[in-house]
Amino acid sequence: VTIDHLFGQTVIKEPPKRVVSAGYTEQDDLLAVGVVPIAVTNWFGDQPFAVWPWAQAKLGGAQPVVLNLDNGIPVDQIAGLKPDLIVATNAGVDADTYQKLSAIAPTVPQSDGDAFFEPWKEQAAVIGRAVFQADQMKSLIDGVDQRFTAVGKEHPTWTGKKALLMEGALWQGTVVAAMAGWRTDFLNQMGLVIADSIKPFGTGHRAVIPRDRVKAVLDSADVLIWTTESPDDQKALLADPDVAGSQATAQNRHVFTTKEQAGAIAFSSPLSYPLVADQLPPQLAKILG
């Protein structure tokens, strides 16, 4: 197969057997189609072998080497693993690093200008093709779409309700929301819309809400989904005076995620989204009916 990407083309002559997952989330896409990488890259959450619970069973007892990007892509360590494919769609590859990696093995970097976190379906589809599993990956992606769409059909009263997808911790002393885009598509599929109130404060994928607008923004949404990772995160948010003093708090319009749910939303993968489709709707239903 031939993969087009930011730095040209990569030809992969046969199904790879020794795949290195060099970015933050590619392990999910590989495991989803039955490819167990020889190395994965840690992102967050301190999970065994940098693989979260929704994907652990797919490891089948394998113990991949765990890499990290703290000092950039560990080119020498990857070379020592003797891979036959390097998947680096979510690794911030630059031209120089691409040359070094592709001297080791065929390398699949980001498709275009998104150095990290290109839309999940694009990343999944490219990785599916790179490991000769394009059809299986397409059916997994379609399956995720169908799960969220089915939730929307089960809850017709959610249509048009305003939601905000919020970071689970304050950032520089204020709250941060996801802008409408691929990261919020799963909410749209369930019938929800992202509240317009964040638009003036958005750059790229996120909106940093000015402190004097926090209350008004929170109160503009019918439901607020905070991607908290612990009860302490929840306490810290509810201790914030503007969050505490909002109508959203008075009317109990907050959903606080578990660590695993927050991870699943962050990973946005064919393996993580089914967990979101199972666990988030009952929490939304408590607020939206």
Language-model-derived ranges and their functions:
Residues 169, 175, 202-231:
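Ligand-binding pocket segment of bilobal, Venus flytrap-like solute-binding proteins
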Residues 75-78, 82-88, 106, 214, ...:
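Proline-aspartate-enriched helix->loop->beta-strand connector
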Residues 217-289:
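Structured C-terminal subdomain patch of bacterial secreted/periplasmic proteins
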Residues 26-77:
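A short, structured surface patch at a secondary-structure boundary
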Residues 9, 96-170, 266-289:
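Extracytoplasmic substrate-binding proteins
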Residues 7, 67-75, 201-211:
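Short helix-initiation/N-cap motifs at beta->coil->alpha
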Residues 18-33, 136-197:
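Basic- and aromatic-lined ligand-binding clefts that recognize polyanionic substrates
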Residues 1-31, 44, 281-289:
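Extracytoplasmic low-complexity, Pro/Thr/Ser/Ala/Gly-rich segments
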